[in-house]
Every structure is written in structure tokens, then in C-alpha cells.
Regions:
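Short, non-transmembrane amphipathic alpha-helical segments
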Residues: 11-25
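A short amphipathic beta-strand at an alpha->beta junction
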Residues: 23-36
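Ligand-binding clefts of soluble mixed alpha/beta catalytic domains
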Residues: 36-566
Length: 566
């Protein structure tokens, strides 16, 4: 801003006026008279002769440029052969800007010149939000973790928690650097403040700030715990993998011959182990996935959740009732329900390829982030299996950690039965789902879309499990078991003595009588649900109830905890 003064104003007075106005207005000020400028503030006032760059500063800047270029040429050729992006280009894909780094000169000596010791740590912004990061540089010793890299990781994670910001880990490492020159005699990476401390920090920081991992290469042995300790893990197709031992070690120890893709590739962890939350085709998609996940999460557990502008669902909510068949055993896709409840293009599914009989994911309702847990009737009728119980339990626990409200869409015949699921731990793992639902203190809403049989309604946050509302649609049925199972349980011995025709007639009569007891209108009259509502009103009801419970109080707990471990 230019301010004009009288010619008689001396330079000292003009400078005082300029300084006072600049401090008051918060912008540079230039004082002028008829002869020209008399005083100015801001960068324009700097003495250009004072901007001298010394030789020692030039040397540092030259070293910085060398460090920024990463490892030797053969390292860059290697990532090109593997189809990978250079780590600094990877950061540029994800971040609006990287504001600073720590430890860029780690292990950068006359003898070593290991740029940043192969691990870049720092701070930046993603969609305007502060995020701390670690990123392996595969061009430096294949991204392996050396002594200084471990130190950098430990400092980064502790500072992120102190600052109250998410941690993003871009993992592209072959694990601990084991060559002899890396350590003194007796050093095994297991010391009190060494490699193990990284995993310790990930554990004790869990639920304090979001931890997101993206896996860009094979991660083997102990370091493979880094990605699975993250709240969310994205794996890049064709180039990523993780396993507790390499294929070579596996063959040496067990005789099994297998490649990395079959041992611990993305599809293994997306469809069988459940360790991976999303598989993406390339690094650009990985960057998009990171931004998507962050858009639902707070900066820290006690910070407000990010809100977005409200947009209508992709499909008309008034058509919801027509989606749900009358017959309790007829299949439909629960995504058709979700599409009529959540804001358009806000659905982000978690573990979509794993335990597909139960759907978990984030969405927005009226711009507010929510976690959705939904039975999937078009896959094994939505029965809950050991894998899906554990999948749901983990998701519920994460939502509770970051105070994200939960919406359960219940349509399940209950927990699966049979010798196979018993051997797979249906009771042991099923209890985790019920435990997580019971202990979650965020706003919880149970929507009974159709079947709510047996212990399935317990896990899906039924009336006894602390739901802030149990809402029933006209198609809802709540029962200890389905009509078929109930009739056989009650009258099995009696029916065994009947001939075929008599038995069929008896079954139909008994089922009809049983149906009267589970009629949702009768149950609503007994207040077994909070509200029976037209399906087309569900979205509006959830909007209102989410708003009402937006400031729900959590019960303060001491450090004593339950015994059910996830």
C-alpha cells in the first residue's frame, strides 16, 4: 500500500509511520512524497547488498541437490525396470506441497553418500491438511532400513502424535539393512531404541492419529509388520507384496516352492488374509486412495471430523422399499440400499474383496462422515462367517477410535453354522464383532432392512447393544431364528413320524403361526424397535438422528480394559 505524506516529513518520521501502519494493517507500506519514496516495509525494504550467499552455504545447497536426486544411476534404472515412480515424484503425486524434511543429511558422508539414508521423513499438506510422512527411497540400497533410517522413523512418528496430525507411510523397502558395516558387534536391530521401537510406537499411537500405509514393493520379514500396523493399507498391483519370509526362505525352511505374488501379493492379502484394504492398479490411483481415506478421518482422535457439502444420493431414496424383496431368502445387492441413503459419490468401501458376505466402508450422509456395516444378501445370504466377523470388528473399532458414527444395515440369517466354521473359530472370532459393537461409544444406528435372526442382530447392534436408534423398515423380521429353523427345532421329533404330505402341510401351518410372532408391526407395538418407518424416509431419519447425536458424550474410562483382543 502506498501512503503519501508532505514533502517536509523527514525520513526517520516516514519510516516510523510506515512501520506503525504495516503492523496495524498487516501488509507492506510505502511512504512517498512528491520527490519519490521515503520509506518502505516488507521485502522491498531489504538491502540487496546484504543478500550475500557464502561459499559454505553454496556447498550445502549443492549437497542438498545431490541428496534430492536419490541413489546412484543403477538404482534409478532398477525402479524403471520395476515400473516404479521415483520416491520424490511419488510424494509430488500425493502432496499439495512438502514443507520440510528431517534428516536429509543422514548417512551422507564422504565415505557413504547414502542420500537421507534411504528414508525420507517430513511434513506436508494434502488437500490443505497437515500430514507427516515417511517414504523409502528404493534407489538407495533398495529402500532398506539402516540405523539412521530407524532413528528418523521413530522421531517422525513421535512428532506427528505431538503435533496431532496423520502419518502417511509410503513403504518400498526390502527390510532391515543387515550388512556388517551397518552395525557394531552385538547389534541386531533389536535394541531398546532400535527397529522394535518403530513397531512399539505404531502400537501405542494406534487410535491417536490416523496411520495410512501404501505398499509399493515387496516387504519381507519383520518390516512387513509396518504396513499391517497401519489403520489402512493400500497395495499397488503388480509391484507390491508382503510376507513374513521371502520365497527363498520359505523354500529353504519348508520345501514349498512359490513366487512372491502367490506368497503375499496384493490379491492374496485382498481376498484371503484381509490384510489389505484396497488394491489399486497404479501409483496415481494410490495417491487418489490416500486423499479419499483422509477425507473421512480427523486429524487426531479428539479433533472434529471433516464435513463436506451435502449432495443428494445417486439414486432416489423413495425407491428403497422396492429394492428389498418380500421373500426373506431372495437375494439383492446391499449396495442398492447404500446408493439410496448416502451422499452421491461418497461411498468408499474397505476390504471390498474380502469376506464379501459383509460390506464395510465410509460414506457421507448430509456431508457427515459415517462408517457403514452391512450384511450382503447376494453372497451366502448375508450369513456372518469368521472372516466377516473379524472384518467388521476391526472396522467398528477403527470408527470408534476416530469418533466416526456407525450405521448398521442388518439383513442376516445369523452366524454361519457347521463343522468348517467351528474349526475356523466362528465363536472365538464372532465374539470380537459383538464385543466391538458393544463397546463402541460413537453414535450407532441399527437399520433392520429384512432378516435379523439369532446372534446376528447382536453383532449388528440390535436393541440390546447400545444403539442410539433401532429403525425397522416394513420388510423387517426380528427373531431368534428363521421360520424354517424354528419349526424344525420345535417340532422335529413330531414331524419325523408324519408322512411326506402331512409333514409339508404341518410345516406351512406352523410357519404361518410363527410368522405372527415376528410380525414387525406387532414388535413395533411392543417397542422392540424405536421406530417403524417407510423405507423411503430412511435417509431423512438418519440425517436427523446423526444431527441429534452429533455431540454424543462418551463414557470416560480408566486404563482398565476388557479381555477380548482384536
Amino acid at each position: 500500500m502506498e501512503i503519501r505524506v508532505e514533502d517536509e516529513t523527514d525520513e526517520e518520521t516516514a519510516r516510523a509511520i510506515a512501520t506503525a501502519l504495516s503492523e496495524h494493517l498487516g501488509q507492506p507500506i510505502e511512504i512517498v512524497d512528491d520527490t519519490g519514496s521515503k520509506a518502505r516495509t516488507g521485502e522491498d525494504a531489504w538491502d540487496e547488498d546484504a543478500a550475500v550467499v557464502t561459499d559454505r552455504e553454496e556447498r550445502i545447497r549443492g549437497d542438498v541437490q545431490t541428496i534430492l536426486s536419490g541413489g546412484p544411476e543403477r538404482g534409478h534404472e532398477k525402479i524403471q525396470d520395476l515400473g516404479k515412480v521415483f520416491v520424490r515424484d511419488r510424494l509430488a503425486l500425493i502432496f499439495d506441497e512438502v514443507t520440510y524434511e528431517d534428516g536429509s543429511f543422514a548417512r551422507f558422508t564422504d565415505d557413504d553418500k547414502l542420500s537421507a539414508d534411504g528414508l525420507i521423513t517430513g511434513h506436508g499438506y494434502i488437500d490443505g491438511r497437515q500430514v507427516f510422512f515417511t517414504a523409502n527411497d528404493y534407489t538407495v540400497k533398495a529402500g532398506s532400513l539402516g540405523q539412521m533410517g530407524v532413528e528418523k522413523e521413530i522421531r517422525l512418528s513421535e512428532r506427528a502424535v505431538e503435533a496431532g496430525a496423520p502419518i502417511l507411510r509410503l513403504i518400498d523397502s526390502t527390510g532391515a539393512r543387515l550388512n556388517a558395516e551397518e552395525r557394531d558387534k552385538g547389534d541386531t536391530h533389536m535394541g531398546r531404541y532400535r527397529g522394535g521401537r518403530m513397531f512399539y510406537n505404531q502400537c501405542i499411537h494406534s487410535g491417536q492419529v490416523p496411520q495410512i500405509g501404501v505398499l509399493y514393493g515387496p516387504d519381507i520379514a519383520g518390516s512387513a509388520y509396518t504396513p499391517v500396523f497401519c489403520d489402512f493399507l493400500v497395495m499397488v498391483e503388480d509391484i507390491s507384496g508382503m510376507a513374513i519370509a521371502s520365497p527363498r526362505i520359505v523354500e529353504a525352511m519348508t520345501g514349498e516352492s512359490i513366487d512372491m505374488e502367490g506368497l503375499g501379493g496384493p490379491q492374496v492379502h485382498a481376498t484371503q488374509s484381509g490384510s489389505c484394504d484396497r488394491v489399486v492398479p497404479d501409483e496415481e490411483a494410490a495417491a487418489e486412495a490416500v486423499r479419499d481415506i483422509l477425507s473421512y478421518l480427523p486429524q487426531t482422535y479428539d479433533a472434529p471430523n471433516p464435513r463436506a457439502d451435502t449432495v443428494p444420493p445417486v439414486k432416489n431414496p423413495k425407491g428403497l422399499d422396492a429394492v428389498i424383496p418380500d421373500a426373506p431368502n431372495e437375494a439383492y445387492d446391499v449396495h442398492d440400499v447404500i446408493d439410496r441413503v448416502v451422499d452421491r459419490e461418497s461411498w468408499w468401501e474397505v476390504k471390498p474383496q474380502f469376506a464379501r458376505e459383509l460390506v464395510t466402508g465410509f460414506a457421507r450422509i448430509d456431508g457427515r462422515p459415517v462408517g457403514i456395516v452391512a450384511n450382503q444378501p447376494n453372497h451366502v445370504s448375508g450369513a456372518i462367517f469368521p472372516d466377516s466377523a473379524e472384518k467388521a470388528a476391526e472396522f467398528v473399532w477403527i470408527c470408534d477410535a476416530y469418533e466416526i458414527p456407525l450405521v448398521y444395515l442388518c439383513d442376516t440369517p445369523g452366524f454361519m453354522v457347521g463343522s468348517k466354521v467351528e474349526q475356523d473359530g466362528i465363536l472365538q472370532r464372532g465374539r470380537k464383532f459383538i464385543y466391538a459393537t458393544s463397546n463402541a461409544q460413537v453414535p450407532k444406528f441399527c437399520v433392520i432392512t429384512r432378516k435379523a435372526y439369532g446372534a446376528g442382530i447382536y453383532a449388528m447392534c440390535g436393541p440390546s447393544f447400545g444403539a442410539d436408534a433401532t429403525l425397522a423398515l416394513p420388510s423387517a423380521e426380528i427373531s431368534v431364528m428363521g421360520p424354517d429353523a424354528a419349526v424344525h427345532a420345535l417340532f422335529g421329533a413330531q414331524m419325523a413320524e408324519m408322512d411326506g404330505e402331512s409333514r409339508e402341510a404341518f410345516i406351512e401351518s406352523a410357519k404361518s403361526e410363527f410368522q405372527e410372532f415376528i410380525d414387525i408391526r406387532a414388535q413395533a407395538a411392543q417397542m422392540q424397535v424405536d421406530e417403524l418407518l417407510p423405507a423411503g424416509d430412511l435417509r431423512d431419519q438418519l440425517v436427523a438422528r446423526l444431527d441429534a447425536f452429533g455431540d454424543k458424550r462418551r463414557t470416560e474410562r480408566d486404563r482398565h480394559h476388557g479381555t477380548i483382543l482384536f
